[in-house]
């Protein structure tokens, strides 16, 4: 977290400004020409997707770089030799990354109120999902950071997999607007379930059942935890 505040402009101001540009371009300029979606103005409809777009990228990059730098510099062996458990090591890196992502997500949410009138139907669920998704993808980023052995690889999955899946996951449109064949294909995109659940907490309507979406998120969380367990158990890329 201390590194976050030392690089405040890059860590917080930059994603907020970028998202504000999305609001201006897609929300104001283009949104005024698009009909309401499920009774929600387009400028309001895209807010959950824009927040997720930033939260996912922040969670992964924060956690992956957080564990990668100790590996790169060799100081990870000091961490591993310290009298702390793998659970505590993981909790430290992941909680720092997730906290920053939640803060950025909350700031973007606050920023969105300058562009549209928000009436969040389930605020408690909204913050719960924000925290849950931040933790889940911080765990995923932690795994990427351990797997990567250079700076190119650490950007590989976020750039070529996560970002495209997020844009194709219903951030700027409803899955129901797609042709039937593309709707079926979209259900294989895990990001669809995240955005659908998060949008439900805002407007009480979603492309996919909230129960199915929550099950998918928790399932991926468990998968990441299992992977990290075996990483420490086997010493994968963290032990000489």
Residue locations for each model-derived region?
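Hydrophobic transmembrane alpha-helices and immediately adjacent juxtamembrane helices
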Residues: 1-123, 128-240
């Amino acid at each position: 977290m201390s590194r976050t505040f030392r690089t405040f402009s890059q860590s917080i101001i930059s994603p907020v400004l970028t998202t504000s540009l999305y609001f201006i371009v897609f929300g104001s300029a283009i949104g005024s020409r698009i009909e309401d979606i499920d009774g929600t103005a387009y400028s309001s409809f895209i807010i959950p997707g824009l927040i997720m777009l930033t939260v996912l990228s922040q969670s992964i990059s924060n956690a992956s770089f957080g564990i990668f730098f100790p590996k790169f510099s060799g100081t990870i062996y000091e961490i591993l030799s310290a009298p702390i458990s793998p659970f505590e090591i993981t909790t430290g890196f992941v909680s720092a990354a997730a906290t920053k992502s939640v803060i950025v997500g909350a700031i973007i949410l606050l920023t969105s109120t300058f562009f549209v009138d928000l009436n969040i139907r389930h605020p408690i669920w909204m913050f719960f999902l924000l925290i849950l998704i931040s933790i889940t993808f911080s765990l995923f980023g932690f795994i990427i950071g351990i797997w990567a052995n250079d700076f190119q690889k650490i950007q590989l999955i976020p750039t070529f997999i996560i970002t495209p899946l997020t844009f194709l996951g219903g951030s700027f449109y409803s899955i129901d607007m797609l042709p039937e064949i593309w709707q079926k294909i979209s259900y294989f995109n895990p990001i669809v379930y995240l955005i659908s659940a998060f949008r439900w907490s805002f407007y009480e309507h979603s492309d996919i059942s909230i129960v199915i979406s929550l099950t998918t998120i928790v399932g991926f969380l468990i998968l990441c935890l299992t992977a990290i367990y075996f990483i420490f158990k086997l010493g994968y890329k963290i032990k000489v």
